[in-house]
């Protein structure tokens, strides 16, 4: 065993000791190495599908700046993988291909880039270069003294004229000088003055506070003000804190901006208040009282609406238009000023009309471009301007009439004096005075009629009434705006409204019956043959010429029956036409046309395409309603806006009075009535009117012409000439002739007899009920039904089920909306039926409750 020496030191002494290390045995043992475990293996397995999608995803940026993945779909990923595999496969085949020698490299087969090219000469620019000089404007800078002087001058000027100053920092502060608390003081616009309720009513920065301190120092800035004197309308006024006496809250900057009071304590608008104080605070704004009065009475005083109101107009624009309307009707400088109200009330009626007329015209000018949005305000102002337009009263004429007959009180001078006084008052006449004036005019008409004697002059043998060879100029058929590219007349909206004529007064021609079934037109004392059969044109020329001859019917010669006279003078438009020798012009064969309206009796006739009906079939007027073609011709001169009202008036006002087989006088009278409503029809051309003296009938020629010939021809070619028949003083046999066919073919629309009988003009009662049931679940059918036959609504009372179904589908509300401005009676019927439906629903509920109670 080996011996070793060990050295031990004790201070400076060194001691060496021998020692032998013990031998140790070595045991060899294999160490167990723990198996490595990947902690993310399971996670990678779970996220493999997501990582696979993220591998092919792209990055996009949202509107808020967030970066997100835009993942591909499985189909897109499959296509990308196939593309990569194809690329790797092509690269592998390229690498494994046999070597090849490259002898030449080109770019698309062109010259190499190193080849030099000649330099092309550049073009010469024949322009003068523009030298733009930037002008530097000096920045205006004011010293502190100059700025203070400017603020002082602005304050003095604005306080004298009670103007306003805008302080623009981060926010704009509006300073207004007003007469408040016995002095001109500065006031700011707080939040509650603009309709906003906030805990802090007014906010401003330090710079704004400094300017407010200088702008608020007006003449009586140091005068003492008590809080009990501050009242409504003083919101926003800036007071001196040092001069303010009473119970008030905290403030800063020696400024107190009035907001309101709570439990007798005055609060600064810059102070933050609690929510409970805010809810119960009395704010000193005039707007509060105004809006309180408006909101409290608006809902109570408004009228019921036939629709669901929505907020479709901007509130600010509504407020501006409300102010415009207020100044147009009740002009004043301040709405709270009693002096303005007294001055308005003390105006004479004539001066008030002039004032309203001027302000209504100014209101229309101020409305400007907003008239398309506020169409109701525009229409009101136009009506107000028209109704208040001053009348130019000629006092000299009044005095002259009064000097002549003023002292005479017997008829007819009494009636003339009444009219003279009526015209002097102008638009100040009351409804009773209008009625008295009309009665006076009636008495004058009767007096003149009784006084006038018809004097017979001349001999009928000298009567001549030639028909002009020139056609009348029709402006409405010559206007380019109403013609298409083929120069055909465009009906526009009139075509839709003309269906009221076709559905009630025309029959569809059934091709199965043939044209021969419609050739004979019956009239009270005979028949007339139409040329509708000639629509089938024979190819044989001789046969065609034979059909062109017509069926001649001999008429008596020219006599008193052919003439119309007044005061002994002939009224030529109301007479039959003659030749140069005095014999009557006899009608010839009039060929038929398809779907045309034929107008004009002088020169060449005009063919206008008929409006389209409900089908493509031909239409022919019902027996006895030939005169409907006159109103259809008048529709050409009616504007598209008035077409609906015109057709309804003809259907509901004219036709019920005329019925079938009306006299020429009655037809002319209804035309005169329509001319008052629609002045444009005065020059409307009429279809040719044939006179049959044997049967005392006037025939209105339609598009199917006339096979019967030999009739006399009436000269009247326009509505204004036809209206001449509507005169009791006119001596004429023709005005008593009948126009139309048999009277029992079509009942009058205004008759009290039920129109649902079999063979009636509309339909049977069962057919009408079926149509009503069909329209309940078809809105388009129901809307058309309400427009054409609104009184079918009454049939809903036959069944509670029908009544409830119509109510649940809103049909009664639709009827009210359609007729509220057209015919109040129909709207009232719809409202009553709606109320009845509610009662039926309540009754059914009560019956169900009774059954449940009895069963219990």
From Swiss-Prot:
Keywords: Hydrolase, Protease, Serine protease, Thiol protease. InterPro entries: HC-pro, HC_PRO_CPD_dom, HC_PRO_CPD_sf, Pept_S30_P1_potyvir, Potyvirid-P3. It comes from the Viruses. A motif (Involved in virions binding and aphid transmission) lies at residues 592-594. A motif (Involved in interaction with stylet and aphid transmission) lies at residues 334-337. Gene3D superfamilies: Helper component proteinase. The active site is at residues 192, 201, 235, 626, 699. It is an enzyme of class 3 (hydrolase). The record marks 284-285, 740-741 as: Cleavage. Residues 618-740 form the Peptidase C6 domain. This is Genome polyprotein. It comes from Potato virus Y (strain O) (PVY).
């Amino acid at each position: 065993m080996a011996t070793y020496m060990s050295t031990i030191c004790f201070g400076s002494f060194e001691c060496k000791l021998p020692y032998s290390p013990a031998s140790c045995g070595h045991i060899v043992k294999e160490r167990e190495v723990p198996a490595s475990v990947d902690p993310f293996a399971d996670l990678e397995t779970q996220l493999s599908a997501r990582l696979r999608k993220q591998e092919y995803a792209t990055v996009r940026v949202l509107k808020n700046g967030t970066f997100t993945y835009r993942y591909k779909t499985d189909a897109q990923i499959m296509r990308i993988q196939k593309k990569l595999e194809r690329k790797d496969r092509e690269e592998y085949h390229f690498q494994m291909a046999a070597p090849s020698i490259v002898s030449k490299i080109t770019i698309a087969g062109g010259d190499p880039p190193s080849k030099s090219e000649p330099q092309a000469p550049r073009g010469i620019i024949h322009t003068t270069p523009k030298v733009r000089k930037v002008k530097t404007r000096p920045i205006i800078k004011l010293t502190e003294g100059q700025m203070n002087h400017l603020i002082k001058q602005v304050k003095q000027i604005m306080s004298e004229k009670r103007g306003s100053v805008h302080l623009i920092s981060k926010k704009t502060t509006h300073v207004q000088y007003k007469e408040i608390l016995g002095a001109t003081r500065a006031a700011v616009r707080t939040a509650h003055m603009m309709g906003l309720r906030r805990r802090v009513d007014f906010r401003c920065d330090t710079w704004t506070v400094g300017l407010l301190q200088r702008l608020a120092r007006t003449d009586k800035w140091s005068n003492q003000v008590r809080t009990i004197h501050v009242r409504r309308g003083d919101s926003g006024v800036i007071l001196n804190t040092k001069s303010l006496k009473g119970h008030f809250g905290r403030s800063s900057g020696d400024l107190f901006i009035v907001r309101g009071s709570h439990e007798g304590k005055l609060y600064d608008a810059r102070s933050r208040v609690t929510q409970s104080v805010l809810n119960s605070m009395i704010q000193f704004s005039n707007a509060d009282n105004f809006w309180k009065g408006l909101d409290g009475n608006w809902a109570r005083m408004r009228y019921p609406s036939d629709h669901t109101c929505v907020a479709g107009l901007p509130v600010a624009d509504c407020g501006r238009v409300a102010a415009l309307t207020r100044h147009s009707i009740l002009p004043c400088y301040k709405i709270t000023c009693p002096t303005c109200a007294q001055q308005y009330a003390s105006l004479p009626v004539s001066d008030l009309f002039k004032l309203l007329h001027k302000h209504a015209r100014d209101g229309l000018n101020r409305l400007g471009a907003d008239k398309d949005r506020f169409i109701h305000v525009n229409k009101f102002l136009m009506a107000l301007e028209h109704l208040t337009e001053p009348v130019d009263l000629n006092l000299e004429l009044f005095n002259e009439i009064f000097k002549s007959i003023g002292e005479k009180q017997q008829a007819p001078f009494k009636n003339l004096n009444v009219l003279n006084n009526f015209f002097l008052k102008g638009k100040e006449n009351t409804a009773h005075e209008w009625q008295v004036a009309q009665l006076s005019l009636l008495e004058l008409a009767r007096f003149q009629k009784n006084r006038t004697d018809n004097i017979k002059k001349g001999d009928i043998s000298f009567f001549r009434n030639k028909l002009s060879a020139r056609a009348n100029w029709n402006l409405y058929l010559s206007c380019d705006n109403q013609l298409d590219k083929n120069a055909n007349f465009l009906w526009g909206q009139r075509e839709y409204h003309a269906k009221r004529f076709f559905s009630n007064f025309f029959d569809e021609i059934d091709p199965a019956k043939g044209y021969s079934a419609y050739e004979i037109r019956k009239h009270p004392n005979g028949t007339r043959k139409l040329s509708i059969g000639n629509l089938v044109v024979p190819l044989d020329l001789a046969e065609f010429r034979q059909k062109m001859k017509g069926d001649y019917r001999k008429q008596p010669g020219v006599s008193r029956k052919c003439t119309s006279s007044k005061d002994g003078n002939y009224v030529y438009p109301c007479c039959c036409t003659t030749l140069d020798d005095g014999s009557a012009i006899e009608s010839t064969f009039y060929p038929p046309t398809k779907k045309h309206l034929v107008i004009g009796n002088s020169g060449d006739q005009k063919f206008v395409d008929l409006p389209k009906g409900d089908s493509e079939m031909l239409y022919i007027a019902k027996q006895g309603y030939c005169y409907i073609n006159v109103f259809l011709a008048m529709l050409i001169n009616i504007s598209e806006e008035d077409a609906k009202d015109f057709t309804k008036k003809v259907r509901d006002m004219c036709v019920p009075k005329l019925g079938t087989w009306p006299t020429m006088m009655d037809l002319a009278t209804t035309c005169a009535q329509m001319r008052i409503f629609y002045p444009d029809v005065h020059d409307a051309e009429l279809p040719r009117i044939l006179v049959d003296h044997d049967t005392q009938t006037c025939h209105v020629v339609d598009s199917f012409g006339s096979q019967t010939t030999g009739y006399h021809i009436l000269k009247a070619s326009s509505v204004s000439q036809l209206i001449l028949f509507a005169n009791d003083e006119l001596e004429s046999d023709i005005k008593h002739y009948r126009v139309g066919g048999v009277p029992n073919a079509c009942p009058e629309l205004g008759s009290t007899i039920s129109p649902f009988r079999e063979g009636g003009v509309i339909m049977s009662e069962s057919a009408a009920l079926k149509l009503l049931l069909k329209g309940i679940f078809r809105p388009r059918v129901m809307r058309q039904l309400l427009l054409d036959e609104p009184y079918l609504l009454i049939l809903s009372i036959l069944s509670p089920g029908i009544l409830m179904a119509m109510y649940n589908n809103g049909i009664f509300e639709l009827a009210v909306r359609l007729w509220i401005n057209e015919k109040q009676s129909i709207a009232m019927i719809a409202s009553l039926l709606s109320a009845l439906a509610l009662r039926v629903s309540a009754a059914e509920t009560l019956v169900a409750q009774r059954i449940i109670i009895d069963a219990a």
